[in-house]
């Protein structure tokens, strides 16, 4: 989940980072989720391994978007059990889900949601996309990547 924090810091977005367990601290989970709106939270990124009930439980207790990050753990099936648990939510309890251990993409998705109401953040995301585009094309500056004949 540290990767999510790094992305949020890079974009200058205020955030909080805490630990809540659906199974070990259910009272804390309920209080956190039920007070999220009144505390001004706009998106919650919830990482969970194993049974991964945390993102779904949070989504069932609040109306703000929840992004689930399946986490590979020592007692999981390479994170696949976590992924399946998070994506198989019942109708009416939506949880957006990213790839296993991909907290960075969870943060980027959260930023896109926030950017709908924040033009400055929207422009930062556009600049980020442009940078990714340029980085992807950078190897083409190497003459070894140019071909005289079409590949097909």
Which residues make up each language-model segment?
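Glycine/charged-rich beta-loop-alpha catalytic/anionic-binding loops adjacent to active sites
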Residues: 13-16, 40, 64, 87-95
């Amino acid at each position: 989940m540290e990767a999510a924090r790094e992305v949020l810091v890079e974009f200058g977005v205020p955030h909080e980072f805490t630990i809540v367990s659906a199974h070990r601290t259910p009272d804390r989970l309920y209080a956190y989720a039920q007070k999220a709106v009144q505390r001004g939270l706009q998106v919650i990124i919830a990482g969970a391994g194993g049974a991964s009930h945390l993102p779904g439980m949070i989504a069932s207790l609040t109306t703000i978007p929840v992004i689930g990050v399946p986490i590979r753990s020592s007692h999981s099936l390479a994170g696949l059990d976590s992924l399946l648990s998070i994506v198989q939510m019942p109708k009416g309890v939506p949880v957006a889900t990213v790839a296993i251990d991909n907290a960075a993409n969870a943060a980027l998705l959260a930023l896109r949601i926030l950017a709908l109401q924040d033009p400055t953040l929207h422009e930062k995301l556009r600049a980020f996309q442009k940078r990714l585009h340029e980085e992807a094309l950078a190897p083409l500056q190497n003459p070894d990547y140019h071909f005289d004949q079409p590949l097909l």
